[in-house]
């Protein structure tokens, strides 16, 4: 499942890193503006409209969660699951960054805070008490939900006058872009990010016919 996690400085509720229900994923797919919080979604929509009327654009973040991936899918080093997902995700226009699990927040954590402790639940499944690793350890799935976020830059094609150069004459100039351009590509990117995750994970699972 995938949702708009952030537009400009407005943030949606994040996925629960330990458990994402099928019902939640289906509900997001039936929304015209896929956010967990409808109130935040409306605020994002209004902010995009304000940027449009201001002849400007906005960036944002898409969060994706993949559930029911068995432990052991992937490979270490260069053929890791994170590598494969990131490679396809960066093929989506306007992508500028990706993070898995706790992402860049781990830089401010202690090892004792970042480490996800393992345990066996009542039905014998091996799980972790937290999911800072985002469902992938050493390039291989752990059995926990795979969670990652993708940052998209604001659309560069805006109607405001901007400084540029005339390459033919090597002189400075001004450009004003005409026509219809999206003030924010993030809503359109939601199914693209989900498809990228599906392709990357399926390609790894095909290497394991027993799955």
Name each region found by the language model.
Residues 6-17, 111-113, 170-175:
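Short, mixed-charge aromatic SLiMs
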Residues 38, 79, 192-195:
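Generic detection of long, well-ordered alpha-helical segments
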Residues 54-172:
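Glycine-rich anion/phosphate-binding loop at the beta-strand->alpha-helix junction
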Residues 1-7, 105, 207-211:
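Short alpha-helical "patches" and their helix-cap loops
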Residues 21-24, 82, 130-133, 138, ...:
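N-terminal, helix-rich and Lys/Arg-enriched segments in bacterial and organellar proteins
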Residues 1-77:
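Glycine-rich, mobile lid/loop segments that gate access to catalytic sites or pores
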Residues 155-211:
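Internal helix-turn-beta structural module
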